[in-house]
Structure formats: structure tokens, C-alpha cells
Design a protein with these regions (language model features):
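ABC transporter nucleotide-binding domains
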Residues: 1-165
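A generic structural signal for secondary-structure junctions
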Residues: 14, 30, 56, 95, ...
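A short linear hydrophobic-aromatic micro-motif
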Residues: 74, 205-209, 240-245
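ABC transporter nucleotide-binding domain
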Residues: 126-221
Length: 266
């Protein structure tokens, strides 16, 4: 933001135009990149001191600000150790601390938990929740739909550069309507999948059907009402079932409905 001129359209951050008021926008935002911007030979504190000087923060205020963000991301005990001794989760915490040095009102985070183990991911989630509680607006990009569901007040589903849907997690999921019935056919019945899908589409209460290899995802108004007819279609076509499941709509179902594919395929 503010580095490259947009090829079209307009954007505002906190009511500020990113082209006409670029300096004011830069003063209001922080950024945590996807690729770690860590120098392994510097300590955590030295990283923050360098950034504080680049932001022209006076030394007396910088020291207090550095201590504050180190405490916020729980890195005080490692602040004076070189970054090469940090674990992956600690390096990500340092990235977040760097993004917080200018005391931003809006923090942009690009894939904040990419490549982290489960424990480290959960810790980063907790730090993001703390930022929200402090009144910081966090805008994050993620391919982890459970992460978006857990952390976000509003979600935009973007496909090929276009916003396909936007709303709260509950709004997006309830907007699909009904439940999802998933049928997994025996691998030897791949040639029957499309014919079965067409037959199921004609059943009462079936809203939509999508297929992926030997799996059918069927959106229905009521699983209890639709399942007998669906299973009847399976039997009539001599298909062998390996697994049957149904669940309330999840964000991956929302993504599938708006893009035609599941996010794990990308």
C-alpha cells in the first residue's frame, strides 16, 4: 500500500486516500510480510531498534515502545539473543513485533501462520486476538479457512483478483442454506460419479451438487428428508459407497460454492 500506484480503482485506509494521502496512510499502518524479514545475526531488540530509527521514533520513546511490543508478543526473555537461535514461532512473533513498532491503527498480515506447527499457530492466533482487543484493525490474508473462521469478524473470498463474497463467517455459512451431504464412492466406481450426480440433482430438497474424483458434495435443505432419495439413487445405479457424512456448512463449502473448487486444490 502506497508503494505502487494502483492500475485502477481507488482505496482508502481510515478514510485516507492511498494515493493522494500516501504519507498519512503510511503513518497509520503496520505490515507483517509473508516471507520473514529477519536478520539472523541481530538480536530481537536490535531488529526493533533499527525499525524504530527508520520510523524516526525518538530514542526515549523507542525504548519504551520496544519493551511494550516485546511483552505483547511474549519475547522479553529472548530479546537480547540473536535471531538465529529463535524457533520458527519465535521468528514469526518477532515479525509481528516489527509490524507493531510504529503503533499502527491498522496492521496488515500476509499469511501470518504459514509453515508453523499447530502449537505455534495457536499462539499467533492468541496474539492476533490481543491486538484486536487493543483496538487495532487487523487485515490478514490466509489460505487456512479455519484461521479465518476463528479470527475474522468479516471475510472476503477472493478468486482471481475478484471479491466473490463478503460477510461475517456466520453470514457466509448461513447464506448457503441447508446442510452438506458428502458421498464417497468406491474408487472402482469413478465412471459412475457424473451419472449419479445428475440423478441426485433431480431429487427433492437437493440444492446443488459438486464432484471431485470419487466424492460428491450435495447441498440439501434437510439431510433427514433428502438422504433416503439420495441413497435410493446410489442403489439404483449400482454404486458402492465407502463413506457417508453430513455437516453444517463450513467455510470451505462457502469457498467451493463461490469458486467451484476447494482451497486445498490451489
Amino acid at each position: 500500500i502506497t508503494v505502487l500506484r494502483p492500475s485502477g480503482g481507488s482505496a482508502r485506509v481510515l478514510g485516507l486516500d492511498v494515493v493522494e494521502q500516501a504519507n498519512e496512510v503510511r503513518q497509520a499502518i503496520g505490515y507483517v510480510p509473508q516471507e520473514r524479514a529477519i536478520d539472523r545475526f541481530l538480536t530481537g531488540r536490535e531488529h526493533l531498534q533499527l525499525l524504530a530509527s527508520l520510523y524516526h521514533i525518538p530514542k526515549d520513546k523507542a525504548a519504551a515502545r520496544i519493551d511494550e511490543v516485546l511483552k505483547l508478543v511474549n519475547l522479553e526473555h529472548k530479546a537480547d539473543e540473536v535471531a538465529r537461535s529463535y524457533s520458527g514461532g519465535m521468528k514469526r512473533k518477532l515479525d509481528i513485533a516489527c509490524g507493531l513498532i510504529p503503533d499502527p491503527r491498522v496492521l496488515f498480515m500476509d499469511e501470518p501462520t504459514l509453515g508453523l506447527d499447530v502449537e505455534s499457530r495457536l499462539k499467533i492466533w492468541e496474539h492476533i486476538r490481543q491486538l484486536k482487543a487493543r483496538g487495532i484493525t487487523v487485515l490478514l490474508t490466509t489460505n487456512y479457512l479455519d484461521e479465518a473462521d476463528q479470527l475474522c469478524d468479516r471475510i472476503a473470498i477472493i478468486d482471481s483478483g475478484r471479491v466473490k463474497a463478503i460477510g461475517s463467517p456466520n453470514e457466509l455459512k448461513s447464506g448457503l442454506g441447508g446442510d452438506i451431504v458428502t458421498l464417497t464412492l468406491a474408487s472402482g466406481d469413478l465412471d459412475k460419479v457424473e451419472a449419479l450426480a445428475q440423478a441426485v440433482k433431480g431429487q427433492t430438497g437437493v440444492k446443488a451438487v459438486s464432484t471431485k474424483q470419487n466424492v460428491l458434495d450435495i447441498r440439501v435443505a434437510s439431510p433427514e428428508a433428502a438422504l433416503p432419495a439420495i441413497l435410493g439413487a446410489v442403489t439404483a445405479r449400482g454404486c458402492r459407497l465407502e463413506f457417508v457424512d453430513y455437516h453444517r456448512p463450513r467455510l470451505d463449502d462457502v469457498f467451493l460454492a463461490h469458486t467451484g473448487r476447494r482451497i486445498k486444490e490451489d
